[in-house]
Every structure is written in structure tokens, then in C-alpha cells.
Amino acid sequence: MTAKTYQDITVGEAPDLVSIAITNPPDKTVYKLNEYFDRTGMLVTATFADGKSRIVSGYSVSPNGALGKTDTTITVSYTRKGITKTATQAITVVYLTSIVISNPPTYTEYYEGNSFNKAGMVVTAIYSNDATKILSDTDYTVTPEILMMKMTSVTISYTENGVTATTTQAVKVNY
């Protein structure tokens, strides 16, 4: 003989969402221009009207595309029962701001029809966070390639992540 027992269970309504907080920041907070935000390591904790808190997933982040020069924070949004709460995470987007000739080329005087010689020239890239990087002579371009009379400078150009920086180098072109 089998007996079955039934018990009434009353299920209360889930408590309302009160707030969210980023309780552990993401592993990465510094990005290159056009990189995407990486959530790895980030923990988002929601607090509810009953005073309880729990780590949640299913949150969204904005911007959710490639990071730009003006992005300084990521907004995290979490919605439950039609209530949305947000929190922000500071980030840094590093991008190329300029280039400088930190050591001039060995040769600055040419004859018409000569090509510019990069020998001895050191070009340094400068970034939005004041970091610098010495460029190899294959990283940048020099225009024009062939030097003509009355030219007084050449243009040095370097492009990184869609940002181009230029500077000039004085030259003297003889007959």
C-alpha cells in the first residue's frame, strides 16, 4: 500500500531589486583603442529589498562594441522584474596622440632626385597615457619618397589602431 501526502506551499513574490555593485573589478581595465571590454574576473552583486545580496550574471555592459577615445567607464546594467539598476567601472583607453623625432637623421642635405635616408633617425610614438614607444624604421612612412628642389621638409607618418600621427623633418635639397 502506498500513501501520498500533499502539503500546500506558499511561494512569496521575489523581492525587488534595490541596487547592484561591482564587487570585484575585471582583470583588465586598460585597453587599446578599438579593443572590446573584457568581463573576465568581474563580479556583479545585486542587493534586494529583503536585504539579501547575491552575485548575478545576465547583466549587460555598455558600450558593448569597440572602445573609443572618449570611453572612460563601462556601465553595467542588471534587470529583474522590470527594475533596472546600474553600476560603473572605470577604464582607460590608450591611443596614439603624436609622434616626435627624438633623434634626427644622419643626413638632412640631399640632391634633387635622391630618396630620403632614415639612417640615424629615431621616431617615438606618444600615447594618451604619456607612454612612449620607439618605432622601427619599418613602422612609419616618409613622404615624398623622391626629393625635389625647393623642398624644405619631409612628412613622417605612423598609423596605429586607425589613428595617424604625423611630424616633419627639415631637409635641404641641392641641384
Region annotations inferred by a language model:
Residues G12-V18, V93-I99, V173-Y175:
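Extracellular interdomain linker/stem segments of modular secreted and single-pass surface proteins
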Residues M1-G12, K28-T29, G51-K85, I91, ...:
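Serine/threonine-rich, repeat-prone extracellular segments and beta-strand-based repeat modules
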Residues D16-K52, T97-A131:
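Solvent-exposed, low-complexity, repeat-rich "mucin-like" stalks and linkers
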